[in-house]
Amino acid sequence: MATVSEFLIERLHAWGVRRIFGYPGDGINGLITAIDMHRRAHAESGDAIDFVQVRHEENAAFMATAHAKFTGELGVCLATSGPGAIHLLNGLYDAKNDHVPVLAIVGQAAKTAIGSEYQQEVDLQSLFKDVASEYLLTLMDPAGVRHGVDRAVRGALGARTVTALILPKDLQEEKAVEQPPHHMNFANSGVGFAPGRIVPHPHDLQRAADVLNAGSRVAILVGAGAIGAVDAIEAVADRLQAGCAKALLGKAVLPDDLPWVTGTIGLLGTLASNEMMQQCDTLLMIGTNFPYAQFLPADDKVRGVQIDANPLRLGLRFPNEVNLHGTALDTLELLLPLLEQKTDASWRETIARHREKGTQIDAARGRISGSDGINPQDLFVELNRRLPDDCVITADAGTSTNWSSRHLKMRRGMKWSLSGGLATMGPAVPYAIAAKLAFPERVAIAVTGDGAMQMNGINELITLRHYAHRWSDPRIIFIVANNRDLNQVTWEMREESGAPDFPASQHLPDVSTAAFARLLGFEGMRVEHIEELVPALDAAFAARGPVVVEVLTDPNISMFPPNITSEQIISFGKAMLKGDPEGATVFAQSVKEVLAGMFAQAE
C-alpha cells in the first residue's frame, strides 16, 4: 500500500505536474523518497515528475514562479521544515505579487512533536498565512491528503496565487487513504480545473465602446494580464487608431516593431510612451496594475476604460469612467464589434514622431564613451541586435533592468519576465534556468548585474552545470553588467534623496563571474574594452553551451527618466554638492547626456 508521500506525488502527477523545484532535508525525506519511486515507476512512459535540485530554496521558489509565468502551468517548489521553509518566502512573494500559480510543499516536525520547540520546528501556519492566504493547510490525517492536494492545486490555478501544504514528518510515512470513506466528516474531491471565461455585461461593454469611440487620441496600456491577446489588441488599436504602451511585466505582450507601439512606460520607459500619456484624451488599460500615477495621464482631462480579470484592481490606479471585469482576450473580442473604425491617422503620426525622437535621443546618448567602463547602452543595443526570434529573456532588479527595458525590443514569439511587483534582486538566473528546462529548444538569456549575481545568481550556475547536458539547443546566456556598484541604489539616492554615493554601502568587490563560469566548465568572457564587446556577443550566440558574458560597464552613466522633474534635478545637484566621490565624473557624463538629447531633438 502506498504511503501518504507516494500518494501525494501521484496526485500531483494526475494534476499534470511534471516538475518540482526544491532542496532535500530530513523534514521531507518521505517526499524525496516518493519522488524517486515515482520516477522509477514512470521510467518507461517518460512522463515522470522531474525533481530539480537547486542551491537554495529561495531559488526553488523563483524557478517555480518562472515556470508558472512562462508556461501558464502550476509551479511547484519543495522545502524541508524550519530553515528550508523560511528560505522559500521571498520567491513565493514574487509569485504572489505577480499573480502566478505556485504551490509550496514544506515539511514540519512530527505531529507528536509539534508545539514542543523541537529541532527545526517553526510555526509554519503563522509564517505562511500571508503569502499563502488563498489556501494554507497543515495535513494531519491521511484521509485529508487527497482533498488538501486537490484544493491547493485548484486554488493556486483558479486564483493565480500561492497556496501551501505543510506535511509533518511522521505523516509522510503513514499509509495513504486514497479513497476516503463516503461518510460525514470526510471530503471526496476530484482532479481537474479549466479556467473560466470572464466577460462583462453587454451594457457595460457598450458604455466602454461609447467612451472609446468618442476619443480622438486613444492611448492603450497593457500589462501581463494581456499576454495571449496580441491579435485582439492589434485589432482594437487599429480600429481606434490608438497607440500602445507596455508596463514592464507586459513587455512581451506586443512586438515593438509595430509603429504605434511606444515601448515600456514609467521611470524605465521611453520618451514616446511618456509623451503619448501626456497628450491622449482617452486611456484604455488592459490587464495591468501599473502603480506610478505620475506616468499616467492627468485624470481630470482624460476619460478611462479598464479591463481586468481581478475586480480588486479595477479603478485602483486611475478613476476610470467604465471598469470592465473580464479576461483580456474574451473581453476585447466582445468589445471590438462595438467600436467604430477611425480614419484620422494624425494621432498615430504624432506617436510615430515621438518614437523617432526617442530613438534619436537614445542613439545620441549611446555614442557617449564611458569614463569608467563601457557605456551600458552600447551593451544593450548590441545585445538587442542579436536576439533570436523565439528567445526567452529574464531580467533582474537593478540598472540592467533599466537599460534592457528601453533597448531590448520584443518581437512576436519572444518571452520576457522579471520580478515585477516585488522587484526583488536575484531572480534572473533561476528564471532563465527554469525557462530553459521548460523550453529546451529556445535560447534563454538572463540580463543581470554584478550585485544580483553576487547575491545568489552565481550559486545557480552550479545548478546549471547539473542540467545543461539535457538540452538539444544548449545555449543559455548570462549577460552580467559589472559596474562594481549597487548602481540602482546609488542613482535613486542621488535623484530622490539628494544623497551622495556612499562607498561602504553601495560599492561591490570586483569578482569575475566569467572566471567562475570557466571553473564550472562553461564559457566565460570578460569584456573590458568597447572593441571586445561585439566579438564576445557574437561568440556567445554561436556557442554550444552555457556562456557568461561579463561586461565592465560605467556606473556613472545616468538613467534619466523620460520626464525628469525639477525636484529630481535639484536632488541630483544636492548630491553632487554634498561630496559625492564620483561627483565630477557623474556631472560631466550627465551634462554630455543632456546635451546629446537636446541636440538630437533639434536635428
Model regions and ranges:
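Thiamine diphosphate
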Residues: 105, 113-122, 315-317, 323-325, ...
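Short, well-structured alpha-helical segments that form the helix of a local strand-helix-strand
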Residues: 149, 354, 534-537
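Active-site diphosphate/adenylate-binding microenvironment
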Residues: 5-8, 13, 26, 31-35, ...
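Active-site nucleophile and cofactor-binding loops and adjacent substrate-binding regions
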Residues: 23-26, 51-62, 77-83, 140-141, ...
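N-terminal alpha/beta PP-like core and its mobile active-site loop of ThDP/TPP-dependent enzymes
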Residues: 1-342, 386-389, 443, 468-478, ...
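Phosphate/pyrophosphate-binding active-site segments
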Residues: 143, 167, 190-191, 210, ...
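Short acidic/His/Gly/Ser-rich catalytic and metal-binding motifs that mark active-site loops
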Residues: 174-177, 253-256, 314, 360, ...
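Active-site phosphate/pyrophosphate-handling residues
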Residues: 7, 59, 378, 459-462
